[in-house]
Design a protein with these regions (language model features):
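Short functional hotspots at interaction and active-site rims
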Residues: 1-161
């Protein structure tokens, strides 16, 4: 019963948005950040029997963070690489996302990271933020994108400066 009340509330909110912002497209987008760094984790690879493969590895802790938002229904998305995960970088990402879809209302679903709930967060007029429950990454489709990028793009790679 409780689950149905939540769904009715969301449906009512979307209907209200359609009335308030008539004529504008409403996009449901999912947002997340992923850290990519120079510290690699060797993965499995194929080789001949009795040969141990050599995979270069180093332990330099330099990271870049990919901020991304994707709309699962259309496949539209926006990604931005930033030096940190904090409120300042999140504000820049939100501003750029707003500029990318200026004529649309964006319902942006985020996880519960501190910079998503910060008092210093500046929301553009066309972005409405809401959060998924804690510890539920399976509810955020963009997590699959990060998983695929890590699997295909950075396996057994040493990134140079």
């Amino acid at each position: 019963m409780r689950r149905n009340r939540g769904l009715k509330k969301i449906k009512t909110s979307v209907e209200d948005l359609k009335v308030i912002h008539s004529g504008k497209k409403i996009r449901l987008m999912f947002q997340d950040e992923a850290g990519f760094g120079r510290i690699n984790r060797p993965k499995y690879c194929w080789c001949e029997k009795r040969i141990r493969p050599s995979v270069p590895c180093h332990h330099i802790r330099e990271y870049r963070y990919a901020y991304g938002a994707v709309e699962p229904l259309t496949g539209d998305g926006y990604f931005l690489v930033m030096p940190y995960c904090n409120t300042v970088c999140m504000n820049i990402f939100l501003k750029k996302l707003s500029e990318r879809f200026p004529d649309d209302i964006i319902l942006l679903c985020c996880d519960g990271a501190a910079w998503h709930k910060s008092g210093g967060l500046e929301l553009p007029e066309n972005i409405i933020l809401f959060h998924i429950p804690p510890y539920t990454p399976e509810m955020n489709p963009i997590e699959q994108i990060w998983k695929e990028i890590r699997k295909r793009g950075f396996r057994n790679e040493v990134l140079k400066k």
